[in-house]
Amino acid sequence: MEQNSAWFMEAKPVAIWLFLCSVMVILMVGIGGFTRLSKAGLSITEWKPITGTLPPLSEQDWLQEKLKYEATPEYKALNYGISMEEFRAIYLIEYVHRLVARLTGLVFVLPFIYFTLRRKISKKVVIKLFVALLFGALQAFAGWYMVKSGLVAKPHVSHYRLALHLLLALIIFALFSYQFFDYQIRPKQTKLKISCNTKYYVGIILVLIMIQIIFGAFVAGLNAGLIYNTFPLMDGQIVPEDLFFLQPTWLNIFENRATVQFIHRALALLILTLVVILTVKNASIKPVYIMLLSVIIQIILGVITLLLHIPIAIAIAHQVFSFILFGSSLYFLCYLRKQTTSPICTFFPS
């Protein structure tokens, strides 16, 4: 027990760092949501990972940036004739978004190098966090890849690329937060016994939450939250009539606004049902209640966002809380792994 406590104290700085990295990712998700809802994401038309750290410093610099923006479809279709002050406002929102992304990278990379060289983290953890670093580099490219889709013909980004951008953020968050939970949750000498299927059940819920977050990105990218602003019915219907008007039929799942919103609603209710069942079956395990509370709050935020036609503050909270819900599920899974025991599951009985 003393050895375990000593290890825990030594790992505390690493745990704090991983927690900070997780919070930074959630902060980025919130800022990204604000940038999108403020329609500021296409105001910076170039990707300069190094030299783009500084904003325009002179009137001439600002004029050059505005001229570049005036060549974009968004300016011509939506913001034609905006003043320099209006342009600066949207430009600075996107600039802060990119600046915080760079800061997040530094918050991760510099301590990662230090802890690795000082051997404060095991080789296994180094490999996992190096994977997170690779995903971070990919995420930076994906962000520009998304923005680029709105600079060509249409004045909005591809909802597929938006979903990719959000999914990569979720993967990075998962790598940081699960490792943080692994440091924080101490193994118990006497472990609580659970059903052999519980961990698999939680894994299924995690996959469904991930799919739900992807469809949330589709809803955002297609502006699907601006239709059927009623709940629980969709303008008086359980199943709206226009779910399958696109051809081929499968395309409706990804590009029909009504279908995408319907799937997003259905997945929310499915996840809620599964979490309630999980809670009932594991009522003696306290972390499951965090998971249940998270899914209830997330659904309430989603319904309010829909009914009030996407108010910015509530919509951002809904996006951010999707990561908190995912994190609470990861926490419960890590808790099960470290503080419970279960019999070996036999899926194919002899």
From Swiss-Prot:
The keyword Cell membrane applies. Heme binds at residues 264, 318. It is an enzyme of class 1 (oxidoreductase). Pathway: Porphyrin-containing compound metabolism; heme A biosynthesis; heme A from heme O: step 1/1. It is found in: Cell membrane. GO terms for cellular component: plasma membrane. It catalyses: Fe(II)-heme o + 2 A + H2O = Fe(II)-heme a + 2 AH2. One of its GO terms (biological process) is heme A biosynthetic process. Keywords: Cell membrane, Heme biosynthesis, Iron, Membrane, Metal-binding, Oxidoreductase, Transmembrane, Transmembrane helix. The keyword Oxidoreductase applies. One of its GO terms (molecular function) is oxidoreductase activity, acting on NAD(P)H, heme protein as acceptor. Its EC number is 1.17.99.9. Belongs to the COX15/CtaA family. Type 2 subfamily. PANTHER family: CYTOCHROME C OXIDASE ASSEMBLY PROTEIN COX15 (PTHR23289), CYTOCHROME C OXIDASE ASSEMBLY PROTEIN COX15 HOMOLOG (PTHR23289:SF2). Interacts with CtaB. This is Heme A synthase. The gene is ctaA.
